Amino acid sequence: MKEIDELTIKEYGVDSRILMERAGISVVLAMEEELGNLSDYRFLVLCGGGNNGGDGFVVARNLLGVVKDVLVVFLGKKKTPDCEYNYGLYKKFGGKVVEQFEPSILNEFDVVVDAIFGTGLRGEITGEYAEIINLVNKSGKVVVSVDVPSGIDSNTGKVLRTAVKADLTVTFGVPKIGHILFPGRDLTGKLKVANIGHPVHLINSINRYVITREMVRSLLPERPRDSHKGTYGKVLIIAGSRLYSGAPVLSGMGSLKVGTGLVKLAVPFPQNLIATSRFPELISVPIDTEKGFFSLQNLQECLELSKDVDVVAIGPGLGNNEHVREFVNEFLKTLEKPAVIDADAINVLDTSVLKERKSPAVLTPHPGEMARLVKKTVGDVKYNYELAEEFAKENDCVLVLKSATTIVTDGEKTLFNITGNTGLSKGGSGDVLTGMIAGFIAQGLSPLEASTVSVYLHGFAAELFEQDERGLTASELLRLIPEAIRRLKE
């Protein structure tokens, strides 16, 4: 976003002060939208010396004469030119400024506007700044942050020792990554994105996006009235073992619930009977295995089954042993269809196989699986969108790095999903997602599109659960997917 600001100013000739004025006014309008008539409130505006502080002075000036009271506490040591300019304007308009923060001052105001640090902050917050932020967080006042809560790294969402906990954050142009990755997402509060006049094509040139309702609605496959099951694709799911009999069913039903025409399950016998007995919609093919796990002896049979489908999902409930490892890697190396690779298939995957494949692949790891795949710690990979992009690009695949904010990337374009709740933190929900992605690929979406639509709907369905989210199960999630699609189309 910094580069877009600079291009807007230098290449398009938009005065930086105009951008700052629009930013400040947009904050006032957003507060009015959230709080109602601002005349009932008293505002304390905390300004640093950077351009974020300059935005704060614009906010304060535009509140003069509108609200009960407004006071700026200047917390900087020196000011950028645009901050200096708006400080001067605020003073000329009769605005009050103090340069010493007294804890008792918080008692005199209803709303605190945080314009201390913006997106340029990199070092940790210590000393007086940390003390002030902690006092603001404990004050119980309504807190509005300008652009990003002070103390959040706008590129990662990490807390730089301490950070403001906002009720409302007003940002400019596009959401920042720090707003959508945790813990920054928890501290942002309600996020409003204001258009302050950047050229549209510069905004559109950004290759990292938040997945939106409108985006997903536009990608949903059409359902022509004159159609048949072949119109909506065929999926093969290779899954299950003597240890895990439910995973194949959850994946299979995930595919059917998003509209797939036909779903076959290849499951070790007798575990396949569970699908046959409970879900007659699923075609369950019994696979004779050695000790209940897939091995190379099942390779040709599974390749044969893959010939008359559009996409293969592999991994849920396979188990993790040397026989499974050999089977998965040889199967994927030989398979000439798109593949969705999940769970145990990721745990045993040799990534060199991905480079050898000529057909598309989607990988859907959670952070633990991703850490094992790239031989790093969970902390190194969780929310690490740059690592995800690098992996996807190097291995010519789509990566769906699952977490509370899920990252979807093909290495060129990256999307962040923010739907969902803690009810998805439960065994089986990932199996459902695997089936959904395979189902949308079968219906004609690209692997990136299918992954984008699926993660959004998966989370949206969880949000529709009528009871406390902790009681959500994968089976309940399946029930809610069609309702999520119906509401999306409204």
Swiss-Prot record:
K(+) binds at N52, D114, S150. Residues 51-55, 118-124 are annotated as: NADPHX 1. Residues 1-204 are annotated as: NAD(P)H-hydrate epimerase. ADP binds at residues 402-406, 421-430. One of its GO terms (biological process) is nicotinamide nucleotide metabolic process. The keyword Secreted does not apply. Its cofactor is K(+). Residues 212-490 are annotated as: ADP-dependent (S)-NAD(P)H-hydrate dehydratase. (6S)-NADPHX 1 binds at Y129, D147. Gene3D superfamilies: 3.40.1190.20, YjeF N-terminal domain. (6S)-NADPHX 2 binds at G317, D431. Residues 1-204 form the YjeF N-terminal domain. InterPro entries: Carbohydrate_kinase_pred_CS, CARKD, Nnr, Ribokinase-like, YjeF_N_dom, YjeF_N_dom_sf. Keywords: ATP-binding, Isomerase, Lyase, Metal-binding, Multifunctional enzyme, NAD, NADP, Nucleotide-binding, Potassium. Bifunctional enzyme that catalyzes the epimerization of the S- and R-forms of NAD(P)HX and the dehydration of the S-form of NAD(P)HX at the expense of ADP, which is converted to AMP. This allows the repair of both epimers of NAD(P)HX, a damaged form of NAD(P)H that is a result of enzymatic or heat-dependent hydration. In the N-terminal section; belongs to the NnrE/AIBP family. In the C-terminal section; belongs to the NnrD/CARKD family. This is Bifunctional NAD(P)H-hydrate repair enzyme Nnr. The gene is nnr.
